Amino acid sequence: MANIKSKIKSITKMQKARAKNNAIKSRVKTAIKKAKIAISTDASNKSDLIAKAHSEISKAKSKGVFHKNKANRKISRLNLFANTYTTPAQ
């Protein structure tokens, strides 16, 4: 445990930031999971859930939780998953 007052404060700030970041990451994971389930089961609201997942990923990117490349990669992989399920097999 830190003895210096400023370090105690910085540890507290880091813990709060980590909790917020983990909450945002969890929201993103949940949104992606729901979208993938909707895509694979061909649910009627799959486009809404994909849009929600894109929105959550973009929010995480704008808040600095995800790097822009990571956010773009997640969006791209979700779109690829959606396209492979929606295009008919040849």
Curated annotation (Swiss-Prot):
Gene Ontology CC annotations of this record: cytosol; small ribosomal subunit
Pfam families, A to Z: Ribosomal_S20p
Keywords, ordered alphabetically: Ribonucleoprotein, Ribosomal protein, RNA-binding, rRNA-binding
A GO term, aspect molecular function: structural constituent of ribosome
Domain of life from the UniProt record: Bacteria
GO biological process: translation
Function recorded in the entry: Binds directly to 16S ribosomal RNA.
PANTHER family for this protein: 30S RIBOSOMAL PROTEIN S20, SMALL RIBOSOMAL SUBUNIT PROTEIN BS20C
Family, per entry: Belongs to the bacterial ribosomal protein bS20 family.
Record's protein name: Small ribosomal subunit protein bS20
Organism in which the protein naturally occurs: Mesomycoplasma hyopneumoniae (strain J / ATCC 25934 / NCTC 10110)
